[in-house]
Each structure stands twice: as C-alpha cells, then as structure tokens.
Amino acid sequence: MALSYEFSIGSVRAKEKNLFTNSDIEHMLGCENVNELCRYLSDKGYGEGDDIEDILTSHSENVWEYLKRTAPDFAIFKPFFYLNDLHNLKAVLKGTLSNRPYSQLLVKPCTFSEETLKQAVENRKFSLLGEELSASCDKAYEILAHTGDARLSDAVLDRAFMELVLKTSEKSDSEFMSEYFKATVFYNNVKTAIRGAKADCDRDFLEIAICDVQDFPRSRVIKASVKGLEPTLDVLSKISAYGCNKAVEEYKVSPSAFEKFVDNRLMSLAKEKCKRSGDGADPITGYLIASETEKKVIHIIASGIRTKTNYETVKERLREVYG
C-alpha cells in the first residue's frame, strides 16, 4: 500500500518526541569523559557502538532506514544526497590520483555508489555521473592530475554540485526545500569569498568557485574578495539576505561564531517552516535536519570533553536544536 503524507507526518511527530531536549544536552555537558557520554547515548537508545563515531553512524543508518520506510517519495532527499556525493567524489578523486585508500572516508546515503565513482574516476568516464556533472568532474580531474591544485579542483566540484542542489530543490514541490538550499548555497558563497580573500585567491579562481544564487551580489563580492579580507567583509556586511550582515558581525568575533550563526539560521528556517507544517514533505525533511544537527551537538560536546574545555565555552559553541 502506498504511503501517504498524512501517515508520514503523524509518524514523524511521534518521533520528534525522542529528539534532544535541553535536559538531555545539560546531561551530556555534565559527562566527565567520552565513555560516560557513550553510555548515556546508548542508554537513551540513540545508537549502538563502543565509541562516539560508531554510535553516530548507527544513529544515522537508523534515521535513513526510518525515512525510507516512512517518506512517500524518498527522492525528496536528493539535494541532501548530492552533498554526500560531493564529499565522496572528492575522496575518490584524490585517493585514486594519489594511490591512497578512500573507502573508509565515504559517507551514506548517496546517489552514486562507491563502484560507480571508482569507475568514473579510474576510467575518466564522468558521463556515468550524468550530463549535469560530467564536464565539471572531468575539468576537476584534469586540474588535479596535471597541476596538483586540490583547492581549484575542489572549487570546480563545489560549484557544479551547488548548482545541481539548487536546481533539484527548486524543482521540488516544497517552498521550504527551495529556500533552505538557496540559503545553503548563499552561505557556501560567503565562506568561499572569505576563504578566497584570506588566501589571496585571484579573480579567475573566484569566478570558478562562486555560483549564482538569488540575493547574492556575485560580481560585487568577487571584486571585493580579490582586494582582501576587509573589503570582502565590508561588502558582505551590507547584504541583509539570510542575515548576512549579522553573520559578518559574528565572523568578526570568531570564525566559529560565524559557523554557529549560519547553522542556527538554517535551523531557524527549518523550525519556522517544518514544525508548523501540516502537509507535504516539510515535516519529514525537518526531522532529518534535526537529526543531523544533533550529531553536530554530540561532536562539539565530545570534543570539549577530550580537550577538557570548560562548560561555558562548550555550551556557547552548541547549535540550536529542533526540539
């Protein structure tokens, strides 16, 4: 029997009750070592394993299996898959050309299997990845194989996949998905412009790396980025879309404060659109984003425990959660 969104939303709303609460986060912050954190997560039924990475992997697998069983149309998650495909293709490309193992670096779920990526790279047959990616992937291969410029090779792939993510999300029936990935690509451009300015990247690099997306003044930002960090931040501080001006203020505090602002901005969008929605795919997508954010929270807490960072500092770094 075909699944309905009415059923899916009811199921997701029940699942949301198991998402982290402030009490859960406080308990994790109080753990004295990573083993204690692992025990807490295992006892809560979050995932299985002897260490944090195993538990997170187990949890991710369970979330995706649940979404497969629950979502009427699993293809709605394609933009998220493409982000994993981007990571995987970079790993396979660099691993193949440097003759290093890469299998352990690959993440799921994804659109392209490890075997497909392997065949595409080893045989330089990027048509296996589809018409929309073929030319850019071949260009990235050419750059890395003949110049060793991993940064430029990555930039070519980033641009191609960001454009594909935009196109795919805009074709969906979800206004939220379109808006969420516009914001994702927007801030990917912001990060690229800042990194480019700090690394003294030339205009040619930035023209390749930064893509067109609504509300992002591409030409103006590229022109500023070539001049350096201060001119770049000045131009970005005058952009109000997606709270960019506020993000720049956070960057001036610290890069980590900026990253937190961006993550929280995306989470606020999900909470505003998905938690209030009573139909369509948005509530299911919101649950996925919530689960991914929880993984970031666990990583931050585990890192704080390992480095013996004080409670207030770790808490300040935590992302806003969905629950």
Q: Where are the language model's segments positioned?
A:
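N-terminal domain-start signal
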Residues: 1-323
